[in-house]
C-alpha cells in the first residue's frame, strides 16, 4: 500500500528527534514514483505547538498499537484454546486476527520511528520485508472479510446447500488460498521498494516505479481488487442477510399470532402437525437462543421425537395475555443485534479504507495537487484510520460475541487460577457437623429421583 507522506508541517522542520521529512517514513509512507523530492516550505510554529502535536501523535499511535497487538493476540489464544469456538466462522476470524496482528507489528513501528528520527535506519532488507508484509496483511484482511461475508450468507440464507461444503477443512483450504493469493499479489512491492538517500545523512524507504503509467495502473488495480469489488460483495451479502432476517422475523411474528389465536379459540393445547417456517417458505429460521448467543448462526428446524407426557402436561394451560408476543419480541431483539453488527462491519470497512485508496489514486494521477491538499493533519488522520482497522476488527467480530467473552473469562481464569480457600478445621473437643433435616430430605429426594420407580 502507498500513502502520502506527512511533511514537516506536522512535527516541525529539520531532521532529528521530533521532526519528520516531507517524504520519509515506513512502507506506508512511500515516495514518489520518479524519486524526486518535492518538499513544501516548513511552516513556522512554536515549540509548544510542535511538542503538543508530537505528544498527541505518539499517544494515539501507542494506544492503537497496544489495542491491536493485545486484542488480536487475545483472539488467537482464545480461539486456539477453546474447543467450543472451533467453528467455520471462527476459523476465518482467526486468520483475520493474524493478518491484523501482522499489520500492527510490521507496519506501525516502522512508520512512526523513522518519522520521529528523521531517517530510515533499518536497512534495505527490512524495508523490502516490511513493505511486502504490510501489503500481504492488508490483502489478507480484506479477503478474510469477504470470506466471512460469503460464509455467513451461505449459513443464513442457503443453509441446506452450505451444510455440504461448510466444514473446517474447507475453511482451512480457503484460508491457505487467501494467504497464497495475497502473497502473489504483493510481489511488486519488494521488487520496487528500496532505501534512497533524501539528504545529508537522511535515508527513506520508498517505492520506485518504472514509470508513472505503471504506478497509475497499480493504484487502480488495488482500488478495484481490494476495495470496490470486496465492498460491493460485502454490501450485497449483508444486505441479503438483513433482508432474510427481517422476512423471517415477520413470518415468525405472524406464526406466533396465529398460534396464539388458535390456542385461545380451542382453549387447550395446540394440535396438528403444521409446517415450520423453514419448511413453509424454504427460508432459514434462527432460534432465539442461537441468535442471542452467537449472532451469526442459523439452523433448519428438523422434526424431533415428541417427549413423553408429564403430569403437568395433562392439564391444559391457559395462555397468558403475552405468551405469544414474548418469543417474537426476543427474536426481534436478537435479530436486530445481528443486523446492527453486520452494518457496523460494512461501515467500518468503508470508513477505514476509503480515504487510503482515494488518496493513493489521487496521488497516482495528480501527485503535486494531492500533496498540497493532504499533507499535514489530513494524511495523519488517514494513517490513524488505516491502523485503527487492525484494532476495531477484534472489537466488532469477537467482543460482541457472548461465547467469546465467556471464553475470554475462562482463559483468564485458567491462566490465573484462584487459590483454594482453606476450610476451617474443627476444634479437638468439637463434634463433627451433622447433616440437617433439610439436607437429609434433599439427599433422600435425590436418591429416589435418581433410582426411579421400580
UniProtKB/Swiss-Prot annotation:
Q: Which GO terms describe its molecular function?
A: cholecystokinin receptor activity; gastrin receptor activity; neuropeptide receptor activity
Q: Which UniProt keywords apply?
A: Cell membrane, Disulfide bond, G-protein coupled receptor, Glycoprotein, Lipoprotein, Membrane, Palmitate, Receptor, Transducer, Transmembrane, Transmembrane helix
- The organism is Bos taurus (Bovine)
Organismal lineage: Eukaryota, Metazoa, Chordata, Craniata, Vertebrata
Q: Where in the cell is it found?
A: Cell membrane
**What residue spans carry the region label Disordered?**
257-284, 422-441
Query: Signal peptide location in the record?
Result: none
Glycosylation sites (chain numbering): 7, 30, 36
Pfam families attached to this UniProt entry: 7tm_1 (PF00001)
Read off the PANTHER family from this record: G-PROTEIN COUPLED RECEPTOR (PTHR24243), GASTRIN_CHOLECYSTOKININ TYPE B RECEPTOR (PTHR24243:SF45)
Q: Its function?
A: Receptor for gastrin and cholecystokinin. The CCK-B receptors occur throughout the central nervous system where they modulate anxiety, analgesia, arousal, and neuroleptic activity. This receptor mediates its action by association with G proteins that activate a phosphatidylinositol-calcium second messenger system.
Cytoplasmic domain ranges by topology: 80-87, 151-170, 243-340, 402-454
Which family would the database say this protein is a member of? Belongs to the G-protein coupled receptor 1 family.
Q: Which GO terms describe its cellular component?
A: plasma membrane
The membrane topology noted for this protein in its Swiss-Prot or TrEMBL record is: Multi-pass membrane protein
- Name of this protein: Gastrin/cholecystokinin type B receptor
In terms of PROSITE patterns, this protein maps to: G_PROTEIN_RECEP_F1_1 (PS00237), G_PROTEIN_RECEP_F1_2 (PS50262)
Q: Which residues cross the membrane?
A: 58-79, 88-109, 132-150, 171-189, 220-242, 341-362, 381-401
The yes or no answer to whether the keyword Glycoprotein is present is: yes
Q: Where is the composition biased (Gly residues)?
A: 265-275
Q: Which GO terms describe its biological process?
A: neuropeptide signaling pathway; phospholipase C-activating G protein-coupled receptor signaling pathway; positive regulation of cell population proliferation; positive regulation of cytosolic calcium ion concentration
Give residue ranges on the Extracellular side: 1-57, 110-131, 190-219, 363-380
Q: Which gene encodes it?
A: CCKBR
Q: Where is the lipid attached (S-palmitoyl cysteine)?
A: 415
What InterPro entries does this protein's entry cite? Cholcskin_rcpt, Gastrin_rcpt, GPCR_Rhodpsn, GPCR_Rhodpsn_7TM
> Which cysteine pairs are covalently linked by disulfides here?
127-205
